[in-house]
Swiss-Prot record:
Name listed for the protein in its UniProt record: Sulfate adenylyltransferase subunit 2
Pathway(s) where this gene product acts: Sulfur metabolism; hydrogen sulfide biosynthesis; sulfite from sulfate: step 1/3
Catalytic reaction(s) noted: sulfate + ATP + H(+) = adenosine 5'-phosphosulfate + diphosphate
Organism: Salmonella paratyphi A (strain AKU_12601)
Pfam families: PAPS_reduct (PF01507)
SUPFAM superfamilies named among the record's database cross-references: Adenine nucleotide alpha hydrolases-like
Length: 302
C-alpha cells in the first residue's frame, strides 16, 4: 500500500476515533449499533482503539429481524465473546407475534416493523441518548447530506431541513429531554477506504463477503442465496450453486449476491476499483419509493 493511501486512512482513523471519544464524553448513555457487516466491524475496531487498553464504555446493540444469514449470527456471537463486549439483542415482540416476514409481507413492511420500529423500541427501552451507526455518505444520496451528529426528535424522526452546522470538527451535542442523536463516525469513508482499512488492520469479517460456491436462485432481478428452508420456490425457480459474494449484508431474502471470484481482500479491493455499480444495488429495501432511504430515516430508521 502506497504512503499516500496509508496517510489518508490514518487521517480517517483519527477523525473517527475523535468522534467516538467526543460522544462517549458528552452523552450520558451511548450505544453502538452493531449490524454485523463490514462497516460495523470497522467501527467496532475503531472504538476498541479509542479506549484501549480499557473496555468499551458502552454496549453493542443488534436489532434482530430473525432473518439474518446464519453466518452473521455466528460471527456476531463469536466477536462479542472474543472482545468481551456487552451485547444487547432486541427483536420486535409485536412483529414476532404477527409473524412478520419478508416473503409474506414484503420488504417495506418487514423493514418498518422489524428494523425501524424494533430500533425505536430498543432505544426507548434502554434510554440511549446517542447511537453510533456505520453509515457512510458515499452509500446513498440521503446519507450524503446527513450530518455526523444526526439529531432525532422524541419520536426518533430525522428532519433533513433542520440540521446543525459542523464547522472545524466542532460538534454541537446539546439536546433537549427526550431527544437523541445518531452518530456516524464513518461518514467520510468510502467503500474502498473500508476495504483498504480492513486489509491494513487485519480486521475479521463475515465470510459472506468473500466469493464461494453458494446455493442461489434468481428472483426479482437479484441473486438470492437460499440460507434456510423458509423459502417457497416459485414456478420455474431452480436453486443452483454459483460463485458469489456479498457487497452488503442484511436479511437474506432481501440481499442480493454478486457473481465474483474475489476470495481474498486484495482481490476484493481490485474488484472494487473497476466496479461501476452501487454498493447497495442488491438491497431490495432501497428499490421502491415507499422504501426509500430518506423516508425510512425520517421515520426513525438507522
Amino acid at each position: 500500500m502506497d504512503q499516500k493511501r496509508l496517510t489518508h486512512l490514518r487521517q480517517l482513523e483519527t477523525e473517527s476515533i475523535h468522534i467516538i471519544r467526543e460522544v462517549a464524553a458528552e452523552f450520558a448513555n451511548p450505544v453502538m449499533l452493531y449490524s454485523i457487516g463490514k462497516d460495523s466491524s470497522v467501527m467496532l475496531h475503531l472504538a476498541r482503539k479509542a479506549f484501549y487498553p480499557g473496555t468499551l464504555p458502552f454496549p453493542l446493540l443488534h436489532v434482530d429481524t430473525g432473518w439474518k444469514f446464519r453466518e452473521m449470527y455466528a460471527f456476531r456471537d463469536r466477536t462479542a465473546n472474543a472482545y468481551g463486549c456487552e451485547l444487547l439483542v432486541h427483536k420486535n415482540p409485536e412483529g414476532v407475534a404477527m409473524g412478520i416476514n419478508p416473503f409474506v409481507h414484503g420488504s417495506a413492511k418487514h423493514t418498518d416493523i422489524m428494523k425501524t420500529e424494533g430500533l425505536k423500541q430498543a432505544l426507548n427501552k434502554y434510554g440511549f441518548d446517542a447511537a453510533f451507526g456505520g453509515a457512510r455518505r458515499d452509500e446513498e444520496k440521503s446519507r450524503a447530506k446527513e450530518r455526523i451528529y444526526s439529531f432525532r426528535d422524541r419520536f426518533h424522526r430525522w428532519d433533513p431541513k433542520n440540521q446543525r452546522p459542523e464547522l472545524w470538527r466542532n460538534y454541537n451535542g446539546q439536546i433537549n429531554k427526550g431527544e437523541s442523536i445518531r452518530v456516524f463516525p464513518l461518514s467520510n469513508w468510502t467503500e474502498q477506504d473500508i476495504w483498504q482499512y480492513i486489509w491494513l488492520e487485519n480486521i475479521d469479517i463475515v465470510p459472506l463477503y468473500l466469493a464461494a460456491e453458494r446455493p442461489v436462485l434468481e428472483r426479482d432481478g437479484m441473486l438470492m442465496m437460499v440460507d434456510d428452508d423458509r423459502i417457497d420456490l416459485q414456478p420455474g425457480e431452480v436453486i443452483k450453486k454459483r460463485m458469489v459474494r456479498f457487497r452488503t449484508l442484511g436479511c437474506w431474502p432481501l440481499t442480493g449476491a454478486v457473481e465474483s471470484h474475489a476470495q481474498t481482500l486484495p482481490e476484493i479491493i481490485e474488484e472494487m476499483l473497476v466496479s461501476t455499480t452501487s454498493e447497495r444495488q442488491g438491497r431490495m429495501i432501497d428499490r421502491d419509493q415507499a422504501g426509500s432511504m430518506e423516508l425510512k430515516k425520517r421515520q426513525g430508521y438507522f
